[in-house]
Amino acid sequence: MNRRDFLIKQLKGAIYLAASAAGLYLPRSVVAGVPAISQVKASHIGVAKGGPGPATRAAVGLLGGMKSFVKPGDKVAIKPNMSFPHSPESATNTHPLVTRELVAMCKEAGASRIRVLDNPTQRAERCIKTTKDALGIFNQDMVHALVNQDFYKPVSIPEGKYFKETDVMKDVLKADVLIAAPVAKSHTMTGVSLSMKGMMGLIYNRQTMHADYDLDPAIIDLCSLLKPDLVIVDLIRALSTNGPWGPGKVIRMDTVIASNDMVAADAKTVHMCEWYGQRFEPRQVDHIRIAHERGLGRMDVENLHVKHIEA
């Protein structure tokens, strides 16, 4: 996708805002059928600069630490990007040291079970190898590439407007805490692939979302069901072009973003990074805008309190 295609793809967002520029800052109840922002939980964002492990721990620390999200005895599901058999330098997968730090913090918080999960698009064991290696011999059994339908359970999506049912990983449905840990990368169909787009890696048949639905609204339907308690965006490197597979232009950011709001996390990532050679506003990404309108979170990061730290 080139810059012109990105703008065309996201034109609806620009038209929406042009029609009511102030709507981004007013309670969303002024727009028919849209929940007011006051009905959405308070959104917090932490941005840490540093290496993968230290920045991950520091970013979560800005939100009160992992114990604010994981309680003793909790079952935790962590969803990084593990779809490709590529090195961290490609920025197509979540940096394994980010994932390792999340696992360590969850163990420190007293989690009774931790699962690191994905449904890779390519050969499963090759895709998850770098993550398993990073976790070490005692934690490798936490990492699973679930490609068999037996690991999934059919569920309905009560708040789905278009995408109303799917098969979700049983481990996710059993989890007390869901942590999304995407790498920041571009995407040929949705502009970017971050925490919301990444939820597609927790269902069995995501191809139907591509083939049978308008993808951006379908993503929001799925996210109305799968709502991460904590989002960690790996912005150590960002794949700013030719995602999600690469190879493309990789930008070194040495940053990790943490938030309790998947919309805010994705919006902050879009705002911070260059995509396709230029800058975009979160509202120009359809699924971010739609999520904001439907009350799943906030894209108006300029109105949120963002904490920063050097790790």
Where in the sequence are the language-model features?
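N-terminal and secondary-structure boundary signal
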Residues: 1-311
